[in-house]
Structures are given as C-alpha cells and as structure tokens.
Amino acid sequence: HEAVAEQRVHAGQEHVVRALTNALDSGRVHHAFLFTGTRGVGKTTIARIFAKSLNCERGTSAEPCGECNSCRDIDAGRFIDLLEIDAASNTGVDDVRELIDNAQYMPSRGRVKVYLIDEVHMLSKSAFNALLKTLEEPPGHVKFLLATTDPQKLPVTVLSRCLQFNLRRLEPGQIAAQMTKILAAEQIGAEAEAIALLARAADGSLRIEEGRRDPADD
C-alpha cells in the first residue's frame, strides 16, 4: 500500500516532506537526518520513501517512480543498500561496528547506501561512540536516517551532526481520513462514527489504530 503510506505521510507532515523535497531538488542532501515524534506518525515511512528518492533508477527525485527494481526492492525490504536496524532489539556495539565497517564500502546496487536506525536512543553508550565516529567523517556515498520517540536520550554529539525533523502528532480528522482510505483500499466496510471514535482515542498516532483493526472483527 505505498500510495496509502505516502498519503499518510503527506497528510500530517507536509513541513518535513517540503524540506526533504527541497534538499533532493537542490542536490544538497545532508549526510544524517533525525526524525523525532511519537509512534505512528510516519518516521520510518518517510525514511523509506527518502531511500527510494535517493536510489530510484530513474534518477534522484523527490518523487521516486515506485516501479523500478530499486523502488520495488526497497518496498519489499530486500534492497541490499538499505540497512535497517531496530536499536530496541540490537543495542550491542558489535551490531553498530559491523554497520560502520560496511559503511566504508561503496553501495552494491544503488547510488547511495542508506542506514535506517529506528529507536536510535536505545543504542548503548559504546554503540553511540562507534556511530559518532562515522557521523564525524561520513563517506560521501552514505546517508544515515535516524528515528526516535525519545530524542532527549540522545547524546548532544549525535544531535549536533543531524538535521532534525519533528513529526507532528496527527489531528483526529487526519487520522479518520487516512483510516477511511486504508479501509477502502482493503475493501473493508466501517461506520464513520466508529472511525471518528477510534481517531479521537488514537492520541495523534495512526499506527496504533492500524494495529487495533483486527480482521477477525470484520
């Protein structure tokens, strides 16, 4: 559901999309980005779309085609030059050292090697130190996309080397609209009143509501 995912991002995070679009259009893309915000506001979705923008076979663009092999492989989670690490489950320095050791090598397929580290604040202190060394002298072919729900726990040395984007909590109306689109795409009927109730209870996060919708309830 890439179209739905991208609609979800654009619905509440236009300020982030606009800044990233300007960077891509100008050809001046920073080496490290930090996306902050609560769960379910589109942090990793934006990061994956950005990875496609950098590696689309039709050229670097704010609007990747979504159809070439690179775009399809990124969507499917099998693009060799997009490395995703969930710091919540990989906090050891060995994982990050391995990641950093590989950063020096040129991309295998794409133009840019992209590292997406989710919940980056959960890395250990030694892991942060290993990451910091690469952020201080980043290879030109590498981009770091860091995401966190708790930026206060990040070392200042890491924060200072990243462009930061705070993703806003979604308004109930935005959540309801996106839920309606998702349900329609999956051909699932739902009452507008029920959607509105869930949207108000979501507290700004769409992911939670996607998780609550159980097909067994249909």
Where is each model-derived feature located?
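Short, surface-exposed acidic/glycine-rich loop or hinge patches that mediate macromolecular interfaces
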Residues: 40, 90, 149, 169-170, ...
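P-loop/Walker A NTP-binding region and its immediately flanking N-terminal helices
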Residues: 1-164
